[in-house]
Amino acid sequence: AGGAGGLFGAGGTGGHGGFADSSFGGVGAAGGAGGLFGAGGEGGRGGHSLVAGGDGGAGGNAGMLALGAAGGAGGIGGDGGTLTAGGIGGAGGAGGNAGLLFGSGGSGGAGGFGFADGGQGGPGGNAGTVFGSGGAGGNGGVGQGFAGGIGGAGGTPGLIGNGGNGGNGGASAVTGGNGGIGGTGVLIGNGGNGGSGGIGAGKAGVGGVSGLLLGLDGFNAPASTSPLHTLQQNVLNVVNEPFQTLTGRPLIGNGANGTPGTGADGGAGGWLFGNGGNGGSGATGTNGGDGGDGGAGGIFFGTGGTGGAGGVGTTGTGGDGGAGGAAFLMGSGGNGGSGGAGLTAGGDGGDGGNAGSFFGAAGTGGAGASTKAGGTGGTGGNGGLFANGGAGGSGGLGGDAGTCLFYTSPSPRDRG
């Protein structure tokens, strides 16, 4: 695990899990806890494996007066060769929790790509109790053989702040992963968007309900049984309509998620507050389509949307992951999307979004896909006045796939 920070120091980054060719990849270590004013450290990424990728480490919790950090990305399940189910992607690490009173939670790590099942996205960290937004859940990993990974759940905000967006479900030719659940607002703030379902009939996650006094429900939130809450939502929708029509973003509310499989960009968050929408995943094709960029966060507070994952290239190159959306004044940048797998070359990871000018964590770059020619990891976002820059994404492994005619993949419940 990463070392704990001093009074003003950030916690250390957790070590990365090791590579394994015939067993489970190593688990990434947790990031260190921050000092009193320090941010938590980044979780380490899980190790690659031909059987099952290691899980990413959790982001370290921040000091009492500081910010959380992002969870490590899940390890990539290796190719088991021809006529085989192949490997299972590792789960993304949980985002670190913010300080006691202020600060946003860290984003969950993305689930790893698996030639059998994609890894589950990590849950977003929780914000400080007074002010701050919940961290975004990580995107589920692509599952080429069976099921895409489930998107991570969005974190819980403070009294003032938005619930974290749920991560998008991973794509699959068989069964797409379901989107993650959006975080619920407390007093003032929007509920987080439910993550979009992955290509392959994945279902959208349930959106979070807004704060008690002011805020808009997240995408795919359940219908309210309270007449007062329903009236509040109807009034806000009427107020938002001219802003949305004239400027392309609401006054209060989250941006819309990009449609899965189109590479559409996520919408921008509200002029006052709101999270950016998640970018849509890229299309599967001869060459995979690029993932959409995450939408920008709201002006006063709001988290940038997570970039969409690049599409799978069936005979060519994988698509590049979309860039994470930038925050403006107070909020965390979105994580970049993972590059898509391709037969000849993996896609590059998307760049992480920039942190807010005053408070918030910078987004982590997306991981490059592993294939004959591994993709390049995305660049981490720029930090704000009181935040470090985001970590760069890991590059994909390169090399020809082997042949293993009788190999069978273990089921997820046999992984221990």
Where on the chain are the PLM-derived regions?
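Glycine-/alanine-rich, low-charge beta-solenoid repeats
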Residues: L7-G9, A20, L36-G38, S49-A52, ...
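Low-complexity repetitive segments in secreted/extracellular proteins
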Residues: G15, D21, A39-E42, G57, ...
